[in-house]
């Protein structure tokens, strides 16, 4: 990569919260994809904050249709570019949150990948439905407190682990699936660039911490993102044709407690009886990642 | 008497084949559809055309559901492609949310709907409930009477939808099975005539990196209402355009099926039977018998249900003694079919004072025999005399099943 950062194609002046992860994710995605890109954005924070009519932060052609159809809209965009003889020059990139990607839009996304459309899907995973007020998604991690899985007298929060979305997308026969994090902009830009240059449906799963939903200071977004990687709760790897081909090593993994303690959504684990046991379970997830992805 | 030269052009083909052929000669760039009875044959024929390389510059997207079929066309249309789909019943209902989105973004997608009843109970046969349930989605809806009209209306609807003053999507509603699966003589649309009639799609705004634009933005209470107003205005502009396009079509192809509405024995009619779709053929047969006896019965075909031709309907029935509306649908909770309700609604705001009665008929493919139409006409004659209108009712209910 050159020392000069690539230009991005999303302007400031949007109405995102201070420290917004989506703004970072969109920015890094476009830095990787470049100006010859059509962006498809399902409903979510990013769409709402970047296009309050008559304003728009997008300096590339951009379309938002619905919450659950970005995969299908991207299919149509790609098919039309092909039919009109424009596909060679233009990249098609969809940027969606975990709700639209992993839950309501999974059917349309699966269809698009199975059909082999040439586009890149970037999931900015902030681990809950932030646009509607921090409700659980299938990307919400184990024991996180959300407004629909709140911690309470008999609950430690979300009772299930995250859905393994990268594995699902790789299982579609995607030529390229990668995880990344907005805490590592160079990594994200490189992976998006690589994904958009590969022909076929490619998928990037980006960790995107949300200060509002997770409960941390707005200046700490990138710091928290880095901490997730350093505690091995967010392994960063690339998969080509279903095989893991590259892993970002974590030499000295930090205890998950550091990551959990920094966020209000896990606060109950430090105050409730039995919280220590729960933290051990989360440490076990990180330990499994270390072993499975050979992070060390 | 059919001109022998014209007769020579006629072929007997399945309705679905004829419609698929029509879609083909309209030169779509992206077709996206999911098979569902009784639309299936349309998309199968199109798939075969694709497999035989007969549709140039076109991509066929074999989606995993109707919701994605319409969503793919949203993306494709926004890039500047002419787009086509066909669906029916549950498939059309599955598209519901995206139908609003298509029209709200003012994307002129065109679709054939092979009308079918909706679940539950599941039923695959014809009525109009599926399309009527989409009446507020902001799509144009043109209902056709026979296969020839189903074919001929496609290029007309593209021309109307893609007019830069309008830019509203539209559906050609044809009765499932009755028209989609019937073999009848038709003239398949000629490519050269269609190229002459239907210019290439040239939208003013598209998704293009050379000139980036934002589609489907977020609108606050400050701006949202104006989008709705402009959408309604576009529909109003479509009213004269539908009329004009039907006439232009006639000039090029020599066939006319009506514009917004069409009349049969209507000018001096004392009793008017109003309906949409293939039932009109049966109604016309019954009316012929009445006319042979010297009774002044006429038929008002409503071709455009959206936009709704209020003015034309008021004018068409102003001299009638009574009007009866036959609806292959019901808005449950009103005991009325939609055409009946809307007809009464537009008459109320006019100076026309005609008694109007309604029947909801032919649900789930139930046959509508000529005897029943005659019975309806007899009831309407009574209303014409008494001036007393009656509650809308189901036709030919089987009391023993209740």
UniProtKB/Swiss-Prot annotation, chain A:
Reactions the enzyme catalyzes: 2 oxidized [2Fe-2S]-[ferredoxin] + pyruvate + CoA = 2 reduced [2Fe-2S]-[ferredoxin] + acetyl-CoA + CO2 + H(+)
Gene expressing this chain: porB
Organism: Methanosarcina barkeri (strain Fusaro / DSM 804)
Enzyme nomenclature, EC number: 1.2.7.1
Assembly, per entry: Heterotetramer of one alpha, one beta, one delta and one gamma chain.
Note accompanying the cofactor annotation: Binds 1 [4Fe-4S] cluster per subunit.
Coiled coil: none
Name of the molecule in the record: Pyruvate synthase subunit PorB
Bias (Polar residues) ranges: 140-150
Region called Disordered, residue ranges: 140-159
Enzyme class (EC, first level): oxidoreductase
Keyword set includes Iron: yes
From Swiss-Prot, chain B:
Name of this chain's protein: Pyruvate synthase subunit PorA
GO BP field: response to oxidative stress
Tagged with keyword Oxidoreductase: yes
Quaternary state and interactors: Heterotetramer of one alpha, one beta, one delta and one gamma chain.
Molecular function terms from GO: pyruvate synthase activity
Miscellaneous comment text of the record: It also catalyzes the oxidation of 2-oxobutyrate.
This protein's UniProt keywords: Oxidoreductase
Primary enzyme class: oxidoreductase
Catalytic activity: 2 oxidized [2Fe-2S]-[ferredoxin] + pyruvate + CoA = 2 reduced [2Fe-2S]-[ferredoxin] + acetyl-CoA + CO2 + H(+)
Pfam families (UniProt xref): PFOR_II, POR_N
Gene (UniProt): porA
UniProt cross-references to InterPro entries, sorted A to Z: PFOR_II, Pyruvate:ferred/Flavod_OxRd, Pyruvate_synthase_PorA, Pyrv_Fd/Flavodoxin_OxRdtase_N, THDP-binding, Transketo_C/PFOR_II
EC number: 1.2.7.1
């Amino acid at each position: 990569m050159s020392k000069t950062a690539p230009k991005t194609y999303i302007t400031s002046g949007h109405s995102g919260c201070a420290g917004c992860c989506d703004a970072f994710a969109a920015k890094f995605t476009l830095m990787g994809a470049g100006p010859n890109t059509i962006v498809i954005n399902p409903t979510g924070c990013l769409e709402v904050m970047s296009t309050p009519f008559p304003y728009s932060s997008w300096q590339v052609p951009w379309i938002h249709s619905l919450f659950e159809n970005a995969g299908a809209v991207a299919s149509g965009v790609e098919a039309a570019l092909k039919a009109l003889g424009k596909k060679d020059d233009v990249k098609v990139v969809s940027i969606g949150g975990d709700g639209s990607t992993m839950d309501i839009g999974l059917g349309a996304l699966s269809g698009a990948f199975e059909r082999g459309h040439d586009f890149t899907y970037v999931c900015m995973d902030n681990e809950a439905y932030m646009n509607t007020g921090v409700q659980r998604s299938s990307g919400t991690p184990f024991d996180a407190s959300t407004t629909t899985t709140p911690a309470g007298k008999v609950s430690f929060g979300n009772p299930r682990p995250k859905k393994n979305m990268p594995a699902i997308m790789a299982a579609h026969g995607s030529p390229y699936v990668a995880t990344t994090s907005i805490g590592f902009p160079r990594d994200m830009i490189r992976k998006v660039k690589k994904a958009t240059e590969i022909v076929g449906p490619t998928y990037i799963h980006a960790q995107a911490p949300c200060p509002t939903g997770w409960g941390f200071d707005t200046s700490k977004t990138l710091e928290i993102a880095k901490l997730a990687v350093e505690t091995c709760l967010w392994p960063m790897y690339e998969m080509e044709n279903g095989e893991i081909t590259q892993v970002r090593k974590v030499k000295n993994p930090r205890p998950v407690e550091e990551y959990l303690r920094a966020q209000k959504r896990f606060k109950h684990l430090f105050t409730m009886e039995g919280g220590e046991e729960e933290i051990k379970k989360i440490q076990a997830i990180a330990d499994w990642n270390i072993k499975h992805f050979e992070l060390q | 008497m059919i001109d022998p030269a014209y007769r020579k052009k006629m072929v007997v083909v399945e309705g679905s084949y004829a419609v698929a052929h029509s879609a083909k000669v309209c030169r779509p760039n992206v077709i996206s559809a999911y098979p569902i009875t009784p639309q299936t044959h349309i998309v199968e024929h199109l798939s075969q055309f694709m497999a035989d390389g007969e549709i140039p510059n076109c991509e066929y997207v074999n989606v995993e559901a109707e919701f994605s079929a319409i969503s793919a066309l949203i993306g494709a249309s926004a890039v500047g492609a002419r787009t086509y789909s066909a669906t029916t019943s549950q498939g059309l209902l599955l598209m519901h949310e995206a139908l609003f989105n298509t029209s709200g973004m003012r994307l002129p997608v065109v679709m054939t709907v092979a009308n079918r009843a909706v679940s539950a109970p599941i039923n695959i046969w014809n009525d109009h409930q599926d399309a009527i349930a989409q009446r507020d989605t902001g799509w144009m809806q043109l209902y056709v009477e026979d296969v020839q009209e189903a074919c001929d209306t496609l290029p007309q609807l593209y021309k109307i939808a893609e007019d830069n003053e309008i830019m509203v999507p539209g559906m050609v509603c044809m009765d499932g099975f009755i028209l989609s699966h019937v073999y009848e003589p038709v003239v398949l649309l000629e490519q050269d005539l269609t190229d002459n009639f239907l210019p290439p799609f040239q939208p003013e705004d598209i998704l293009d990196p050379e000139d980036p634009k934002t589609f489907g933005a977020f609108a606050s209470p400050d701006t949202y209402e104006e989008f709705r107003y402009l959408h309604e205005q576009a529909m109003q502009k479509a009213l004269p355009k539908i009329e004009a396009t039907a006439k232009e079509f006639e000039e090029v192809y020599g066939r006319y099926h009506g514009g917004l509405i069409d009349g049969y024995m209507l000018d001096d009619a004392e009793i008017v039977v109003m309906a949409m779709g293939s039932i009109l053929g049966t109604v016309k047969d019954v009316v012929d018998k009445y006319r042979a006896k010297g009774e002044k019965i006429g038929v008002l075909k409503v071709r455009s249900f959206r936009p709704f031709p209020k003015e034309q309907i008021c004018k068409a029935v102003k001299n009638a003694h009574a009007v009866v509306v036959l609806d292959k649908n019901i808005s449950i909770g009103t005991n009325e079919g939609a055409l009946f309700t809307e007809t009464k609604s537009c008459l109320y705001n006019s100076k026309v004072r005609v008694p109007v009665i309604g029947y909801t008929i032919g649900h789930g493919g139930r046959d509508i025999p000529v005897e029943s139409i005659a019975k309806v006409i007899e009831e309407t004659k009574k209303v014409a005399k008494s001036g007393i209108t009656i509650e809308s009712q189901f036709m030919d209910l089987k009391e023993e099943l209740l």
